[in-house]
Amino acid sequence: MSEFTNVTIIREANVYFDGGVVSRTVVFPDGTKKTLGIMQPGEYTFTTGAPEIMEILSGELDLKLPGSDAWNRVGGGESFDVPANSSFTMKVLSLTDYCCSFLG
């Protein structure tokens, strides 16, 4: 889906890692939320409360998911699932545009 209709955008930015990751929250009529953001090159570890689906719209990163010691390359047009109450690490290799869907 390349656009969202009938949504509310929270104007205040979500800023992480001194501006290395910045996003805006989109709230849908049913109350579900997504964030649309940009990641600068760097290494970032995030923790989750709810399960998430991360869609990489453009860019490239190496990903380490919970319970794994392996790094996997993820690029534009790909996505990955993150379980609830966990953490994951990304080594962002180039400017990366993403959409994160919160499932819980």
From Swiss-Prot:
Disulfide bonds: none annotated. Its EC number is 2.4.2.1, 2.4.2.2. Keywords: Glycosyltransferase, Transferase. The keyword Iron does not apply. The keyword Ribosomal protein does not apply. It catalyses: a purine D-ribonucleoside + phosphate = a purine nucleobase + alpha-D-ribose 1-phosphate; adenosine + phosphate = alpha-D-ribose 1-phosphate + adenine; cytidine + phosphate = cytosine + alpha-D-ribose 1-phosphate; guanosine + phosphate = alpha-D-ribose 1-phosphate + guanine. One of its GO terms (molecular function) is guanosine phosphorylase activity. Catalyzes the phosphorolysis of diverse nucleosides, yielding D-ribose 1-phosphate and the respective free bases. Can use uridine, adenosine, guanosine, cytidine, thymidine, inosine and xanthosine as substrates. Also catalyzes the reverse reactions. HAMAP family: Nucleos_phosphorylase_PpnP (MF_01537). Belongs to the nucleoside phosphorylase PpnP family. This is Pyrimidine/purine nucleoside phosphorylase.
